[in-house]
């Protein structure tokens, strides 16, 4: 027989070159990770959250090492046993036996193969395992929920913290044992313990014992898996059922089947182990086949029979107990218990007089006419200032107190720097990263008014009224409102961070370099003085950042001095997710003025995906609406069955400081993470009153809850099973929308306290199941006293939903004719704003839709959308006009607009006198009257709850009459609270007399 060819020996030079090549490859693979690790070490330290970084690194490293060692050791042991117990003499099948050649090659590199393969397997397993560090930490630090599951009576902490870890361990034991089986099988085959030559082949005693032992251990692991499957039944979804969790078939067929299969698996494992002694391979083969057949017959066949024969004919009755479990668990898991949600019957179609509408001051004075999804171009046109400043396409809503102490909602935005808008030499490295470093200003517009009436030739009407807190031309901070601000410079924000290689080099290094503001004669620069930023004054950090950003200017530019710092990772949500990696953040991040500083407020959620009997849903699907689709701003596609808005986070817009506050201190998941990362989350008591005033009920949580309330408002399990009383989230009726209607932040009368005080709330209408009639109206309070309370107004009958209301408004003869004239020959692009649904009067609903037009003239200012009309609908009646006042008067009659907010004063063109404000101003393009409607008489000026921004001079008599109107309104509200109908009627008459007196007074 010809001897097998030997592997050629490598020369010393070849070995050195191979070693160098391997070192270069390792450096290329690990170098960027080492650089990123060091940069993150610096970044977390600068933020004060280095313990978060080190805890992650240590946990990942220990998990990697533990799993790598276990997998490597198991595979090594399997290979070593196969090698150590190999036959002394191994016959070959001839000179061309391929196994002999492989055997020779392996023997020539035995140490490399014997160590390299286990090391490679261990490294791969460790790399995968370290991604599950959160599951391990929750297992180590998780506590109890104080609530037990309805089937086994086990605390829910077992399902949240323990069961996922046990399943993870079982999965890795399966994988390790299976890999050991494969390694041992190949080893015995390679070294002759298993031979396939001849009719029956041969199997050595050592190979039989080792392989059978591994198969038996796999069966024992399968028995453990059947045991754990019992608990996972409580959070799985069976196809065709309208609820999550174990149903009748699962409890009465699948659950016993799991126990039976577990016993069969143990018996089969014992049978397999017996083959070690009995030396009969038919026994383990029979055991494996028996387990497979049992899983098909007992595990799948029997439940199918029970489902088809017993459950299907009487599904509603059979499943009612388990539906009740699902209703209770879902309400608990998503914060929809009776303590959090109040249901009230609400007519939805009650009639309302002009006096009743005027008496609803909290709502009528705050009717929102600015759509934050439309007015961003107007912000850009009038408040951009420089080409490199920018506002996001979708602005935000927040509330502030006006000068009279009244709660008002505002469209707010931070004027950020957008590096993508730099041009020409502004884009070079020095300008991009050390000159244009920050934004400037907080812009707010009252959402219930605009500057003047659109189409008035003497005024630039229809645009937002801007309150800009900025660095002024003299370097002083100009802060007219809505709250005092000391530092308007913005170094951190979502716009500035939405650029690749986003970083700014700041700090004292010679003369001030950062662009700040301009005077009439010069440009003024600024030097950053905040605490944020990683120092890069030494050569080590400069070299590290040069490697990170592949930018040699870090090494050679004189812009960087010993006091220089680098600002990076400037997106507020990303910063929060970095220091709290266990949080899922809301897609909406909004700016607010808190304690005279601009901060970004970020809502953080803790979630679970295995809460027993709770509805399992896609977070991405549940939070999708027309706004998110338009911006392509969607939540990750993760499954959740439990969610809490457990953390409120703030990010300082100037220095980037991240502060985490515990919003839901009773959340067991939050409590577990606070044990993992102690001292990183501040208690709820540390939330200042100023910050509390600007915390909003988060949009994504609200959208998840409204989707669940569509089903889980039903108490009766039989009705739930039939789905006959379900609701639907309405589609956005706007012609340009393509998804569900988003919820809207508004200031209106307080539904949580059920009084006429003003409240900032997040609201949504709900339709009947697969119909366009209203079923409910949901309001979530953001007020500090009632924060998080959900009020659900259930509406009987056939009250028009958003789609029907919008169709009625847009097809109304007067509306369509007027807008047809305005948009004739494409002179103007008509855009409908958000359709608001507002509870009004003593049981009615008012729909309000602002209408915008973007003229096509060459004038740059006129190419931006301005408010031209306000359309309303109440009980199938349409109101329409240039202002809220006009629309209310058109809809309810004279006096309905007594407490509505009118347009603010505007600056007249040069050389012209100011025009009077109010309804006595001649409308340049008043909407036509409806067919059969008498011409509307010109109404005199009427009282308003909040004076317009421009100066208004009233006569002594008129001022006294206005005081009488306000006194009558106060008396009417007192009568409403007292519930005395006689007193209420007298108060209404008093208000009517006061309004008539005001209108008659000159």
Swiss-Prot record:
Residues 937-950 have a biased composition (Pro residues). The keyword Chloroplast does not apply. Keywords: Cell membrane, Membrane, Transmembrane, Transmembrane helix. It is a multi-pass membrane protein. The keyword Cell cycle does not apply. It holds the Pfam family UPF0182. GO terms for cellular component: extracellular region; plasma membrane. Residues 893-923 have a biased composition (Low complexity). Belongs to the UPF0182 family. HAMAP family: UPF0182. PANTHER family: UPF0182 PROTEIN SLL1060 (PTHR39344:SF1). This is UPF0182 protein Mvan_1814.
